[in-house]
Design a protein with these regions (language model features):
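C-terminal "cap" of GNAT-fold acetyltransferases
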Residues: 86-88, 123-126, 130-172
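Acetyl-CoA-dependent GNAT
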Residues: 9-12, 16-98, 110-112, 116, ...
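Glycine-biased, low-complexity coil/linker segments
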Residues: 175-177
């Protein structure tokens, strides 16, 4: 059974390994300098996740997924973009490595982010994704996230980080949908 929990300091190495394994598939879709920049950004983000909650999925003592949930009001710098203060909580770096996919791990991590954002009284939850992340985009849309073009930014020439937003005034997505 997969358990969803807050990360522990001892999880740090496994979180980096799981995240890089999950995102490695995008290396082939990006020009080498862009992939190097993206990989470096992932590593820098994971080196100090504050003020985000680092949430993990664990199965049989091994991490099989991870996600960051930044609180509303957090100040951040989007890669290649201007510094922003988050109006709503934001999901970042949802990661499930290939060997753990197809088991609902990503959905469970997203459901936990939604639960926590609602518990904090947030009116919405946001995230960014890109066209190369089509499987993730379908999951987000099935869970009720809708495009929020006003949140888009460009981390590099020709790349658009697409904003998505989930209003939290709606009922929770039902388990098993999608």
């Amino acid at each position: 059974m997969t358990a969803i929990r807050d990360a522990r300091p001892s999880d740090r190495g496994a979180i980096l390994a799981v995240t890089l394994a999950a995102y490695e598939q995008y290396a082939a879709a990006l020009a080498p300098p862009l992939w190097a920049m993206y990989r470096q950004n992932i590593q820098a983000t994971l080196a100090d996740v504050r003020p985000a909650a680092q949430i993990v999925a664990e199965e049989g003592g091994a991490l099989v997924g991870t996600v960051l949930l930044f609180p509303a009001g957090a100040g951040m710098a989007n890669p290649g973009g201007k510094p922003v203060t988050l109006e709503w909580p934001e999901v970042r770096l949802l990661a499930v490595p290939p060997a753990a996919r197809g088991k609902g791990v990503a959905r469970r991590l997203m459901e936990e982010c939604i639960r926590r954002a609602r518990a904090a009284g947030a009116p919405a939850l946001t995230l960014h994704t890109a066209d190369i992340m089509s499987v993730a985009m379908r999951l987000y849309e099935r869970m009720g996230f809708a495009r929020a073009v006003e949140l888009d930014f460009s981390p590099a020439p020709g790349i658009v980080a697409k904003g998505y937003k989930l209003p939290l005034t709606l009922p929770s997505p039902q388990r098993g949908e999608g």
